[in-house]
């Protein structure tokens, strides 16, 4: 009888263990999300601490399938050369270029990071992921022309923007972008700026190559089709992350990690809330999707080589800035025009309709309500966008490409972006356009929230994660020396340091096979 009872007990224990969470040995770093942010941070950490064990968890069957995918973003190497929303005009008429300078400095860091990876053969064939495409601003109407002229003049005080061309001459602008000028109403007041060193970037390709290089290391493990289901802090300040294997009957595995990075794009908010850290209190998200008109007609594509950005309508949010872009996606040239806003309660393109309602908590419902009241213009904009017909979209395109033909263009759905809503002492809650790193006080978990300028600033944003989460390590001579190898200008500003600007751009441009135009002293 005792033997029978013992056998039954053993069978019971074995049966329970099959259904219980399988536990694995601890890792140094767990990266949640298989996009460019996680890939960049993983690459940094592998180079700084080659002996550290790193795991990456991605819900889909491939990396770089959400916001990093070439079709899910505009592919602009954001340098503030053409994006008019990065400069603002004060009430006294002065032009504030501080944000434009910061954006440009950040992209120069990203270029250095990528150039270093080319040197190390981590990234291969720069033409597969970055190409020169001139960045242009194009406006019409007296007020907009006056704004662009003033913006151009203000930017010339920064060495980073020296060499930007400005013209109000229709013939000159036609040489730059013939499709924008052909069929345009004669006598229309127009102006344009042009920066030849602008770039088009395939962030998905960068991500795939970075992860591919990491995957060749014994210290790295990639888990595809795994979804994080739970995130709990342990008494020793490590984290136990429970995930389900979606390709294996949702079998659950737990991983213990010293440091967790939540780089899951639109999915980051829910995971941050799951962590329960007090720093996450009060954050909420508002999802906004986008679509573009696209053409691959070679007769059209070959006649446009530029990213042409316009000026957003009064009252419209920053993400509404229209642009006509030359793109290189998967080695093929494409023209895209947009974006046109779409709305879904999903936080990810491959997410759930319950993402938005499921993210509402007692701690963030107040900020969400207050942000909604204060952003009535955004609500009106979204409603207007959702009511657009294909004829309406083509009419918008013809403001930039007057002779565009309906049959050449089709609507493609891009990715989802989750804009940050956070507590505000004065307003109760504010909608914030940008990115923000949220880190636990002990640095054991960090999350990236928000969208624009996004992937263009992956390298500097992940540097800020290192500085917050590994403060003591960053201060060591060893990490300082390595960071200055990876990003030669690390710790210094390029703006108005002509020698440093020229040497840095020349170094990265040579490796990335980009044109380099030396900066000249201010006239």
Swiss-Prot record:
A GO molecular function held by the record: L-malate dehydrogenase (quinone) activity
A GO BP entry: tricarboxylic acid cycle
E.C. no: 1.1.5.4
Catalytic activity line of the entry: (S)-malate + a quinone = a quinol + oxaloacetate
Cofactor: FAD
Pathway(s) per entry: Carbohydrate metabolism; tricarboxylic acid cycle; oxaloacetate from (S)-malate (quinone route): step 1/1
Keyword Ribonucleoprotein recorded: no
Any Pfam family: Mqo
Keywords assigned by UniProt, alphabetized: FAD, Flavoprotein, Oxidoreductase, Tricarboxylic acid cycle
SUPFAM superfamilies: FAD/NAD(P)-binding domain (SSF51905)
GO CC term (a single one): cytoplasm
InterPro entries for this protein: FAD/NAD-bd_sf (IPR036188), MQO (IPR006231)
HAMAP family reported in the protein's UniProt record: MQO
Family affiliation: Belongs to the MQO family.
Protein name listed in UniProt: Probable malate:quinone oxidoreductase 1
Species of the source: Pseudomonas aeruginosa (strain ATCC 15692 / DSM 22644 / CIP 104116 / JCM 14847 / LMG 12228 / 1C / PRS 101 / PAO1)
Lineage of source species: Bacteria, Pseudomonadati, Pseudomonadota, Gammaproteobacteria, Pseudomonadales
Name of the coding gene: mqo1
């Amino acid at each position: 009888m005792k033997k029978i009872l013992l056998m039954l007990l053993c069978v019971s224990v074995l049966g329970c263990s099959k259904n219980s969470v399988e536990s694995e040995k601890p890792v140094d770093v767990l990266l949640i999300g298989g996009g460019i942010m996680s890939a960049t941070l993983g690459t940094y950490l592998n180079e700084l601490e080659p002996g550290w064990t790193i795991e990456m968890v991605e819900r889909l069957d491939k990396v770089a399938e959400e916001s990093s995918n070439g079709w899910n973003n505009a592919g602009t190497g954001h340098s503030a050369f053409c994006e008019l929303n990065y400069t603002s005009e004060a009430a006294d008429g002065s032009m504030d270029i501080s944000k434009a300078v910061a954006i440009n400095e950040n992209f120069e860091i990203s270029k250095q990071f990528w150039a270093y990876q080319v040197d190390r053969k981590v990234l291969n064939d720069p033409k597969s992921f970055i190409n020169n495409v001139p960045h242009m601003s194009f406006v019409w109407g007296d007020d907009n022309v006056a704004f662009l002229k003033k913006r151009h003049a203000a930017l010339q005080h920064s060495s980073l923007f020296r060499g930007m061309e400005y013209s109000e001459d229709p013939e000159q602008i036609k040489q730059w972008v013939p499709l924008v000028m052909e069929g345009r109403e004669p006598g229309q007041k127009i102006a344009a700026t042009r920066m030849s060193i602008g770039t088009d970037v395939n962030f998905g390709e960068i991500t795939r190559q970075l992860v591919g290089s990491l995957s060749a290391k014994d210290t790295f493990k990639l888990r595809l089709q795994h979804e994080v289901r739970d995130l709990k802090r342990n008494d020793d300040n490590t984290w136990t992350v429970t995930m389900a294997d979606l390709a294996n009957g949702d079998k659950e595995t737990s991983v213990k990690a010293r440091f967790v990075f939540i780089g899951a794009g639109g999915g980051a908010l829910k995971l941050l809330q799951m962590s329960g850290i007090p720093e996450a209190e009060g954050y909420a998200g508002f999802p906004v999707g986008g679509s573009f008109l696209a053409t691959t007609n070679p007769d059209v594509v070959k006649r446009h080589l530029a990213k042409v950005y316009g000026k957003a309508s009064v009252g419209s949010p920053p993400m509404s800035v229209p642009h006509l872009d030359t793109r290189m996606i998967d080695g093929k040239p494409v023209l895209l025009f947009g974006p046109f806003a779409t709305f879904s309660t999903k936080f990810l393109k491959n997410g759930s309709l319950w993402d938005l309602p499921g993210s509402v908590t007692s701690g963030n419902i107040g900020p969400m309500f207050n942000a909604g009241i204060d952003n009535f213009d955004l609500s009106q904009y979204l409603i207007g966008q959702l009511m657009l017909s294909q004829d309406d979209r083509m009419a918008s395109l013809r403001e930039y490409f007057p002779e565009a033909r309906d049959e050449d263009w089709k609507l493609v759905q891009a990715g989802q972006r989750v804009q940050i809503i956070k507590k505000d002492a004065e307003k109760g809650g504010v909608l914030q356009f940008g990115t923000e790193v949220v880190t636990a006080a002990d640095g054991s978990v960090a999350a990236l929230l928000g969208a624009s300028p996004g992937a263009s600033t992956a390298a500097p944003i992940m540097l800020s994660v290192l500085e917050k989460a590994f403060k003591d390590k960053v201060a060591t001579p060893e990490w300082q020396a390595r960071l200055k190898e990876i990003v030669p200008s690390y710790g210094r500003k390029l703006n108005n340091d002509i020698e440093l600007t020229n040497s840095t751009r020349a170094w990265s441009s040579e490796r990335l096979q980009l044109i380099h135009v030396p900066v000249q002293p201010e006239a």
